[in-house]
Regions:
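Solvent-exposed, polar/charged alpha-helical surfaces in well-ordered, non-transmembrane soluble domains
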Residues: 49, 53-54, 74, 78, ...
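Cysteine-nucleophile amide-bond enzymes
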Residues: 101-158, 173-179, 288, 316-318, ...
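Active-site-adjacent structural elements in enzyme catalytic domains
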Residues: 135-138, 142-234, 327
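Predominantly the structural core of cysteine protease catalytic domains
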Residues: 167, 195-340, 345-376
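Compositionally biased alpha-helical segments
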Residues: 20-138
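Positively charged n-region of N-terminal signal peptides that target proteins for export
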Residues: 1-4
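Bacterial N-terminal signal peptides
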Residues: 7-17
């Protein structure tokens, strides 16, 4: 009997000796150690809480510690079951989860911002036709500067309408997206030419403008091209507007595709039975922080001793972007509008000028209101 029992014990001991030593010595949650030395630091009264592919977390006499498994010596790495491949897989999964979470957050923020913008836009439209409250001043220029949307120079091509539309579009897009993005006037010039199958004639030296009209595209033609062809970032088709060049090279198919999928823009003519009503509605838009592209009669350059449209006789047509107004009396007829021009920052007040209500009520032709729509 004793001999048989002794044989069983020996067999058990032999079987135990065949088990991997590493398994018997593996550290994991619940493992208690009198001490654990990692590098130059010795932790005492250690109790392991968690072990994952990257780290081990444990309690010790003086608090809590989290150590990367990759920083352990090989013997401890083996005891904690460190596997570099498993760590890499865990890191990849973590990064993917972070990107997915960021994408969901960005989409939610964009959706909330779009809903808010739409609500504000609809509220503004509901005010059209009602008397607009004229404030002392509404000035979007500081926000334009903050977004680095400075006055551009159209060069010698008759493209003022393109620049006026793009200026308004860049601003409302930046307000909606939260970050500024510059768009390609070069592309929109090409697109407008495609839509109406014509090119404008080159503008002469503005210092001797006289009767030389900026006879390019009408605002309605430009916004038709915008709705038809879209618009890409400026980086996709940089502006190459020269001093005399009048023809724009066609963009690549890829750029056209990008432009058409870059979002949809709804275009509205500012309503009004007359220019006085239109200007009243423009005040509503500016109060809501929405710039307006306008087409108006324009005086001879020699008659503009200051960047102010007041009582000069008109000589030709031009397009600019209204970005604010001043009205110290609160009466619409005493308003002076602020506009952004496309003749460079050296013109006027850093590229901006002014137009009295009296001038615009007589000479305003067109006023365009742009509305961003959700991307498909």
């Amino acid at each position: 009997m004793k001999s048989r029992l002794f044989s069983v014990i020996l067999a058990c001991l032999a079987l135990a000796s065949l088990l991997p030593a590493a398994e018997a010595e593996r550290y994991g949650p619940g493992t208690r150690l009198e001490k654990l030395t990692i590098g130059a630091t010795t932790y005492r009264d250690v109790r392991v809480k968690t072990v994952n592919a990257r780290t081990v977390l444990f309690l010790h006499r003086d608090g809590m510690a989290s150590i990367k498994l990759s920083e352990l010596d090989p013997a401890l790495q083996e005891k904690f079951g460190y596997d570099p491949a498993a760590e890499a897989e865990s890191d990849a999964a973590m990064q993917a989860a972070i990107k997915e979470r960021e994408a969901r957050t960005a989409a939610a923020v964009a959706q909330r911002r779009a809903a808010q913008n739409q609500s504000q836009f609809d509220a503004m439209l509901r005010l059209f036709g009602t008397p607009a409250p004229c404030r002392d001043e509404v000035d979007l220029r500081p926000r334009f500067r903050e977004l680095e949307l400075y006055a551009k120079d159209q060069g010698r091509r008759p493209s003022c309408s393109v620049f006026a539309v793009v200026s308004a579009l860049e601003f409302i897009n930046a307000q909606s997206a939260g970050t500024p993005e510059k768009f390609s006037e070069e592309y929109l010039i090409w697109a407008t030419g495609r839509v109406i199958q014509r090119l404008g004639t080159a503008v002469q030296d503005r210092s001797q403008a006289g009767d030389d009209a900026d006879t390019g595209y009408a605002l309605t033609e430009v916004v038709t091209a915008l709705r038809t062809y879209g618009i890409p970032p400026e980086s996709s088709m940089p502006n190459t507007i020269g001093r005399t060049k009048n023809i724009t090279a066609a963009p690549s198919t890829e750029v056209i595709t990008e432009a058409r999928t870059n979002g949809q823009v709804a275009v509205h003519l500012v309503p009004g039975r007359d220019t006085a009503t239109q200007l009243n509605n423009i005040i509503h838009a500016l109060n809501a922080g929405v710039p307006i592209a306008i087409g108006t009669a324009w005086p001879r350059f020699s008659n503009m001793r200051a960047a102010l449209l007041n009582s000069q006789p008109p000589a030709y047509n031009h397009a600019v972007t209204l970005v604010g107004y001043r009205c110290p009396t609160g009466k619409l007829e005493d308003t002076t509008f602020i506009f952004k021009n496309s003749w460079g920052a050296a013109w006027g007040a850093n590229g901006y000028g002014f137009a009295t209500y009296r001038y615009l009520v007589q000479h305003l032709h067109t006023a365009i209101l742009l509305e961003l729509q959700d991307r498909p």
